[in-house]
Amino acid sequence: LNFEGPIIKDRTSFNIGLRRTWLDVLSAPAVAIANKITKKDGTRLRARYAFHDLNLKVNHIFNDRSRMYLSLYNGNDVLKGGSTDFPDQDSDNNYNYDSDVSLRWGNIMATAGWTYVFNNRLFGKVSGVFTRYHSRLRNTEHDVVGNEGDEDYSDSFRENETNTGITDFGLRTSFDYMPASAHHIRFGGDYLVHRFHPEYNRSVAYEKNEETSVEIGQEFANDLLWGHEAGVYAEDDWTLSSAVRLNAGLRFSLFNVQGKTYTGLEPRVSLRWLLDDNLSFKASYSRMNQYVHLISNSFISLPTDAWMPVTRKLKPLISDQVSAGFYYNLNK
């Protein structure tokens, strides 16, 4: 679904989009048919996948030079599966075993920004940003044998839950300045606060029988880290001639975590030289400092992958990238 329209004529407008999958609804009859077939064997299956997302944007025009916008995104996915084992039609046993696993993950992103045109050569933008990512993996097992009061009665339950997430919020500024037709200068800065929740594990279990009852609850690996990141940058997109174009810039970055501050310079330069209408030569160099790392499984990427910052002992990674080559356009 998508809706858009004015709130205040010629001043304020909105656009909202909603989306949801029908997969879980359409697959429900197939699961029901499968369970009808497997019921005589003492098995019941459960399966579900669904997602939804929401996009919202509101624009407001103060005047020809000044305008403001607000954007919001929210998306969530859920994947569930499980089964129940129980006595088949020909069995005299009395038991019930449930096993379930669920995976949930989602994002929230919100931005509020203001753009202003100072003159025909300079305009700028200021924005506040908020993002949050969270995932949760939970598996449960529930095993019941016999009836309460029977000599062979037992009831056991186990649940394990793993949560990961990262939350960012901060400010960004950017400016575009065109002092001459051959120069397009961009500059600005940003400050972000990171809240890392690499892993939070929770485990709950109990065992019951006619003689004893034991209940266990445990939390572990509940780490929480805060990081502060700031940077300023400037670059010039310089048209030297109709054939040669040069882009050069420099960024200064800073990252503070656990009382330790790391800084770094990140230069970058790129050149494009048109040799004729179809042939060009391009070369570039850039340096980057990586303060945040994605910790993932080496075999498969899952929503439970965790984000981790550098620490007092783990220094940032520095990468230098150089590329050069000739390019030919075959479409002309």
Which residues fall in each region the model found?
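Outer-membrane beta-barrel channels and translocator barrels
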Residues: 8-10, 61-65, 119-121, 178-182, ...
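Surface-exposed extracellular loop regions of Gram-negative outer-membrane beta-barrel proteins
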Residues: 78, 85, 89, 134, ...
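Flexible loop and strand-edge segments within Gram-negative outer membrane beta-barrel domains
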Residues: 23, 47, 65-117, 132-165
